[in-house]
Amino acid sequence: MAKTLNYNKAYFKKRDHLDLHIAQSLKLIVQENNLKRILDVGCGSGKLVRFFQKEGFNAYGCDNQKEAILLASKINKKGTITKASAANLPYKNNSFDLISAISTIEHLTQKETEKFLDEAYRILKIKGIIFLITPNFNSPLRYLTGSRWFGYSDPTHITFFTPRTLFDLLKRHKFINIKSRLKSAYNIPTNLHLPKQVHSVPMPLKNMLNYLMISSPLANYRDSFWILAQKKS
């Protein structure tokens, strides 16, 4: 992350939450692929790490910001939170089954993102999985809202991707089985993937819409997109 940007305590406190829908959907991926050892890169306040630790997994987190490390260390097991840059991960080769980076790569320069993917590939085990969420530069709402688009609202967002550009980048860094349409946890309240105009619709309809926005072709048109890839054997 660029050192000149203001990642202070207020920044991380404002974002001190866990989207349970993301956590449970990621848990489905972990269980279906029998993954045990997890690293959350850009872990922020550490809520996702804590979620997986409580679920019985060997979960770790890293962030390069002091305030994030202080917050994450308070709620997670001793020795599981590390101060580190995404572009220089201090872990052994082939040491993790899953690497997640939730709303992280938009904070990196293009060069840092390239280094992060190399580092992720290095420390993933054979057939290990990388899971990313980032703002979608191809979102219809970006074209409709212009400068008011949510991706622009955070000045620490410096690099943007579309599902296609990130797919190509992952492929260049030797990842395989790249997917942006994923199985989603169902029946978990969330407004995260829906336009504000439909936040008040009945919960059954909202659940169906959320599912479609992740597991159908609509996934590539959300404001933020999910993408998963695997280290080749």
Regions found by a protein language model. Give the residues of each.
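S-adenosyl-L-methionine-dependent methyltransferase catalytic module, highlighting the catalytic core
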Residues: 15, 110-119, 129-230
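A structural micro-motif
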Residues: 57, 79, 128, 175-176
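Helix-to-beta-strand junctions that scaffold the AdoMet/dcAdoMet cofactor pocket
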Residues: 108-109, 124-126
